[in-house]
Curated annotation (Swiss-Prot):
Organism lineage string: Eukaryota, Metazoa, Chordata, Craniata, Vertebrata
Biological role: Binds to muscle nicotinic acetylcholine receptor (nAChR) and inhibit acetylcholine from binding to the receptor, thereby impairing neuromuscular transmission.
Subcellular location, record wording: Secreted
Disulfide bonds: C3-C26, C20-C43, C45-C56, C57-C62
Organism: Bungarus fasciatus
Tissue: Expressed by the venom gland.
GO cellular component assignments: extracellular region
Protein name: Short neurotoxin 1
């Protein structure tokens, strides 16, 4: 599986270079801070704290 791996401060999305495997989900997290909205994309589907929106998916680059 190819998941995009990016934090909001990174200028562009880049593949994770083999860190995701066939049975691993991709994830897209968003949350608000005092500086505005933040986004984090990567591999896996972690448990998150209340207030963080998490979307997990199972196809290549589905976390765009």
């Amino acid at each position: 599986r190819i998941c995009l791996n990016q934090q909001q401060s990174t200028p562009e999305d880049q593949p994770t270079n083999g860190q995701c495997y066939i049975k691993t989900d991709c994830q897209n997290k968003t949350w608000n801070t005092h500086r505005g909205s933040r986004t984090d994309r990567g591999c896996g589907c972690p448990k998150v704290k209340p207030g963080i929106n998490l979307r997990c998916c199972k196809t290549d680059k589905c976390n765009e």
